[in-house]
Amino acid sequence: MVKAVAVLGSSEGVTGTIFFTQEGNGPTTVTGSLAGLKPGLHGFHVHALGDTTNGCLSTGAHFNPNNNEHGAPEDENRHAGDLGNVNVGDDGTVSFSITDSQIPLTGPNSIIGRAVVVHADSDDLGKGGHELSKTTGNAGGRVACGIIGLQG
């Protein structure tokens, strides 16, 4: 089993830890908890770069090795990094578990060394009709991020 972790933080007070596990060539399970967010849905994505030299802005676009349009996690035509939304409670926290087959921890499309990003707004899953729907899901600014690193 391969394991990875990302510790999220931001200048806006958002914190969290996200764990990634993958058994063999199976899907990757993503579990985590976040705090300090406004209640409601927040876009949640793996971005292409593990560069936080300019905060979350330097993490690049959504991880998209197949050059697809933005979409929902269940869509076949989607960025590999499109993980949908996390639903934050009234207390500003969320715990979640996601299983996804497009974000492996090994191989040529590994997400190790890339960033995971939480956005200010909900991801419209490419279906919102906004000019940004097919690229970012119109999910707004980047409120927290962390680099995905191998875990022992």
Swiss-Prot record:
EC annotation from Swiss-Prot or TrEMBL: 1.15.1.1
At the top level of its lineage, which domain of life is listed?
A: Eukaryota
Biased region (Basic and acidic residues) positions are 71-81
What cystine linkages occur within this chain?
56-145
**GO function term, MF aspect, one:** copper ion binding
GO biological process terms on file:
removal of superoxide radicals
- Keywords assigned by UniProt? Antioxidant, Copper, Cytoplasm, Disulfide bond, Metal-binding, Oxidoreductase, Zinc
Named cofactor requirement(s): Cu cation; Zn(2+)
Pfam families from the entry? Sod_Cu
Q: Which residues bind Zn(2+)?
A: 62, 70, 79, 82
The cellular location(s) given in this protein's UniProt record come to: Cytoplasm
Going by the record, the broad EC class of this enzyme is oxidoreductase
The note on cofactor binding and number reads:
Binds 1 copper ion per subunit. Binds 1 zinc ion per subunit.
This protein's GO CC annotations: cytoplasm
The UniProt annotation places Cu cation binding at: 45, 47, 62, 119
Report the catalytic activity. 2 superoxide + 2 H(+) = H2O2 + O2
Q: Region annotation Disordered: residue ranges?
A: 62-82
Could you list the residue ranges that cross the membrane?
none
Q: How does it assemble?
A: Homodimer.
UniProt xrefs under PANTHER family: SUPEROXIDE DISMUTASE CU-ZN -RELATED
Q: What is stated as this protein's family in its record?
A: Belongs to the Cu-Zn superoxide dismutase family.
What job does the chain carry out?
Destroys radicals which are normally produced within the cells and which are toxic to biological systems.
Q: What is this protein called?
A: Superoxide dismutase [Cu-Zn]
